[in-house]
């Protein structure tokens, strides 16, 4: 009988064990290397690169910038983001720029934070405030009694409404209207739709982008970005990650109220305005290097690698 009960317990615990391979709880320590190669240039250009910085959950212990091109740091108009600005010339073609971080990251839970949450009620270019989103938000939250419950109702709605799918055209821009209509997309689309509904319900909500540091290995390449969101309820910020909840349904309850420790936030917000301003305008969101030459964007190859550190 005892053996049978043990087997039953393990059977029910198995999804949790499998899911835990994707997250680190508590604290994580890692090195991340963000490296890029300047493409062949025919004229002098301007290169913008997001810089990770410390906050209450993310301590940047070291941030070493190695560049053959002179650089300076600036901040965006909101003050939320730090940005590296360089002016590479044709002679710099093929040269490499490397940013090496050593980070201690804490698992993020519901938390209080200084600042004005009301600024996160404003619409953005691809996250509008409109009667359609207001009607959806009002319908979904009709039975909720406070903003935390409203946020949970909207989280559940987006999770049920959308499916993680990067096929076709239109995904990956963080377009709330696209997400609402297509019912599919990547992390930018999931969270754009969620943030739009929160704001339509008069709940401040914000977007961030960076990396998931793989939990199932201790070194290697990272393929690209990941993004997530937070909403403000009962004087605290509540972290959510709905696209990861869609990919890992067994963690859906966890991802309402938590971001795991194996993350690095690079930038926060949408429609990011910086001086000098790119000819293309504010950054929709800011993850990869952005290079412009003669007012036109030029692709930059970037690679991202990590190594987990002992404390």
Please annotate each region the language model reported.
Residues 3-14:
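Sec-dependent N-terminal signal peptides
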Residues 255-311:
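Alpha-helical and coiled-coil interaction segments, frequently adjacent to or embedded
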Residues 40-42, 89-95, 142-145, 199-202, ...:
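A short, structured loop/turn motif at beta-sheet edges
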Residues 47, 154, 229:
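Terminal peptide-recognition signature
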Residues 150, 154, 183-198:
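Active-site nucleophilic cysteine motif
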Residues 192-280:
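Hydrophobic/aromatic-rich core segments of domains that either
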């Amino acid at each position: 009988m005892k053996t049978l009960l043990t087997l039953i317990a393990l059977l029910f615990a198995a999804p949790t064990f499998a899911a835990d391979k994707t997250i680190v709880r508590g604290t994580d320590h890692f090195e991340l290397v963000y490296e890029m190669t300047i493409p062949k240039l025919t004229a002098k250009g301007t290169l913008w690169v997001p810089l990770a910085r410390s906050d209450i959950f993310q301590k940047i212990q070291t941030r070493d910038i190695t560049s053959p091109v002179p650089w300076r740091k600036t901040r965006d108009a909101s003050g939320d983001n730090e940005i590296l600005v360089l002016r590479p010339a044709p002679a710099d073609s093929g040269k490499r720029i490397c940013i090496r971080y050593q980070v201690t990251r804490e698992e993020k839970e519901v938390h209080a934070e200084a600042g004005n949450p009301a600024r996160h009620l404003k619409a953005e270019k691809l996250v509008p405030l409109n009667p359609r989103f207001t009607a959806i938000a009002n319908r979904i939250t009709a039975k909720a009694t406070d903003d935390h419950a409203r946020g949970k109702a909207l989280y559940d709605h987006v999770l049920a409404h959308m499916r993680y799918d990067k096929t076709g055209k239109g995904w990956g821009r963080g377009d709330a209207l696209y997400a609402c209509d297509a019912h599919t997309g990547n992390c930018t689309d999931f969270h754009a739709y969620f943030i739009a509904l929160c704001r339509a319900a008069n709940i401040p909500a914000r977007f961030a982008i960076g990396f998931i540091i793989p939990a199932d290995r201790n070194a290697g390449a990272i393929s690209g970005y990941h993004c997530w969101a937070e909403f403000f309820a009962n004087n605290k910020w509540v972290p959510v990650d709905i696209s990861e909840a869609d990919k890992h349904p067994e963690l859906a309850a966890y991802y309402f109220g938590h971001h795991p420790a194996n993350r690095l936030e690079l930038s926060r917000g949408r429609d990011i305005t910086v001086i000098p301003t790119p000819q293309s305008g504010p950054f929709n969101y800011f993850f990869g290097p952005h290079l412009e030459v003669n007012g036109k964007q030029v692709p930059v190859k970037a690679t991202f690698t990590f190594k987990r550190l002992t404390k």
